[in-house]
């Protein structure tokens, strides 16, 4: 519940070019600052983040955080222009418009998405909980 913000850390990967290394979301009022990912030491964070036991599976070169109540609910796009990407269902096409943009990341109603570093695979997710045990910050490490 509440307002969430998203951030992406992009890194220069030489011949691979600039890639999305980390995608993060934080609760606007309680989550740790995005400096946690800007420092580039996300595997050794000082924010008391916990590595989750699941892998974030990627098979389309993109991953994101979404409000479960609205995930793949096409009604969130009713007021938006039609997506430019022409393959797949409406949700997928809108997400691809974001990940195929110059930024390779962005927000949509009830979510945030980015391209996934070097593409498909399994990636690690970390979370931070507030004093009540409610998750208020999460990020996926791609690179």
Predicted ranges, named:
Residues 1-143:
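Intrinsically disordered, low-complexity acidic regions enriched in Pro/Ser/Thr
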């Amino acid at each position: 519940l509440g307002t969430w913000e998203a951030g992406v850390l992009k890194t220069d990967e030489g011949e691979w070019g600039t890639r999305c290394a980390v995608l993060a979301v934080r609760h606007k009022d309680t989550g740790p600052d995005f400096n946690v990912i800007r420092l580039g030491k996300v595997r050794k964070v000082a924010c008391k983040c916990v590595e989750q036991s699941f892998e974030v599976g990627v098979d389309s070169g993109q991953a994101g955080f979404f409000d479960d109540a609205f995930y793949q609910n096409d009604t969130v796009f009713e007021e938006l222009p039609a997506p430019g990407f022409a393959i797949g269902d409406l949700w997928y096409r809108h997400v691809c418009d974001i990940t195929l943009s110059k930024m390779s990341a962005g927000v949509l109603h009830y979510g945030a998405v980015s391209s996934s570093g070097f593409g498909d695979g399994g990636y690690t997710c970390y979370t931070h909980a507030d004093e009540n045990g409610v998750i208020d910050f999460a990020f996926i490490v791609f690179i």
